[in-house]
UniProtKB/Swiss-Prot annotation:
Taxonomic path: Eukaryota, Metazoa, Chordata, Craniata, Vertebrata
Keyword Cell membrane belongs to the record: yes
Name of this protein: Claudin-5
Function: Plays a major role in tight junction-specific obliteration of the intercellular space.
Extracellular side, ranges: 29-81, 145-160
Assembly, per entry: Directly interacts with TJP1/ZO-1, TJP2/ZO-2 and TJP3/ZO-3. Interacts with MPDZ.
GO BP annotations, alphabetical order: bicellular tight junction assembly; calcium-independent cell-cell adhesion via plasma membrane cell-adhesion molecules; cell adhesion; cell-cell junction assembly; establishment of blood-retinal barrier; establishment of endothelial barrier; maintenance of blood-brain barrier; myelination
Topological domains annotated Cytoplasmic: 1-7, 103-123, 182-218
UniProt keyword terms in alphabetical order: Cell junction, Cell membrane, Membrane, Tight junction, Transmembrane, Transmembrane helix
Gene that encodes the chain: Cldn5
Record family assignment: Belongs to the claudin family.
Amino acid sequence: MGSAALEILGLVLCLVGWVGLILACGLPMWQVTAFLDHNIVTAQTTWKGLWMSCVVQSTGHMQCKVYESVLALSAEVQAARALTVGAVLLALVALFVTLTGAQCTTCVAPGPVKARVALTGGALYALCGLLALVPLCWFANIVVREFYDPTVPVSQKYELGAALYIGWAASALLMCGGGLVCCGAWVCTGRPEFSFPVKYSAPRRTTANGDYDKKNYV
């Protein structure tokens, strides 16, 4: 596969991952109610996200409430907000950088500089994936830990929501896409070639007697 094809494929994966990350950030399904007691007929399901919580009735009616106070939120929710939004914005910057250095655009003249710009964009995309992975894993760790904590009431136990799985998939796409962009750009950067200077000396003219020609002497 050519370097330009690698860049395009990587950019497509990064764009899909970026959309998935935005979707995961906005969905109120980071944790959902866990049904552990099958003898109890539940009339509603609770979803919780970074920006709102929703209650879904058994009839299908859903009512959501936006978090009004930032200070009242838990530390993991505040950190997840900051890191996820930061990853989304950084991915936007990475998009402009990658498009500037991509081989399919003419923003920069073709050459090593253009390839290094694309290489920077791919590295930024990979960094976005890692940045988004931190709050996702942190949040999931807290949900799992509270789920197995015997001191937490059954009614307050939650399971991993769909937004976490979408976020993990988006992070993987961002890192894989960024890696492909870097691979495609690395081919075009050009590797430095090292060579040793070769000195040539003019041949000496000699006479039949093996001495220098007398006309060389004054």
